[in-house]
């Protein structure tokens, strides 16, 4: 066989190998898409690396907020949060969650994280995976016209992973029923460390519920 007879064969082999790689790549992409869709359908949050921002503005503090599932929409809960002014953490640029008042006098603030309630003595309750909780960070909230110290926030209902809340008064039984505003354990630790550093605190004000508190 002459040398030139090999050229089509080599070309065919190269095209075949390239085609196999393309099919494998498409299968990998399809698998990732299916995993994301399945996670969303099951109510799971796909982890993403969030950047912390240090803000000073009015905000809603939901670290211990009680929440009630929204009628007709089990994926959302309505939470009653405190309106605060001062340093806080968010995972979007501060201007994105800047408070505002519309032409009708309706005041909008956003749920952001702060250490204030822990400094006031609230302790951190850890709850097991599978129990319902709400994720309020960065969510828009409407300030109560009858009580400007309170805001109503619409938060996501989740049942993923171990989570914490400053609500519940250390009563673990409420983890299954109360729909507390909470946070994933790792995110809470990361946010706490960030604020301690930004505020130049000597130590964190966070205290945890003890085994003796369980009931």
Located regions from the model:
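Bacterial N-terminal signal peptides
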Residues: 13, 34-43
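Sec/Tat signal peptide C-region and signal peptidase I cleavage site
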Residues: 44-50
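Bacterial Sec-dependent N-terminal signal peptides
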Residues: 28-29
């Amino acid at each position: 066989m002459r040398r030139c007879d090999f050229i089509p064969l080599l070309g065919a082999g190269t095209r075949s190998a390239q085609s196999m790689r393309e099919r494998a790549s498409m299968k990998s992409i399809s698998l990732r898409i299916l995993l994301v869709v399945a996670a969303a359908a099951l109510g799971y949050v796909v982890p993403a690396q969030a950047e912390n921002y240090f803000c000073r503005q009015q905000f809603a503090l939901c670290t211990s907020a009680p929440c009630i599932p929204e009628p007709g929409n089990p994926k959302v809960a309505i939470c009653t949060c405190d309106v605060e002014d001062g340093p806080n953490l968010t995972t979007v640029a501060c201007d994105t969650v800047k408070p505002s008042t519309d032409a009708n006098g309706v005041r909008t603030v956003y749920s952001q994280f702060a250490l204030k309630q822990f400094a006031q003595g609230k302790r951190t309750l850890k709850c097991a995976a599978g129990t319902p909780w709400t994720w309020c960070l960065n969510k828009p909230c409407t300030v109560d016209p009858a009580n400007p110290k309170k805001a109503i926030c619409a938060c996501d209902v989740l049942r993923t992973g171990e989570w914490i809340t400053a609500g519940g008064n250390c009563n673990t039984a409420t983890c299954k029923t109360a729909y507390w505003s909470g946070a994933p354990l790792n995110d809470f630790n990361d946010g706490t460390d960030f604020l301690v550093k930004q505020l130049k605190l000597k130590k964190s004000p966070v205290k945890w519920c003890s085994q003796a508190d369980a009931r």
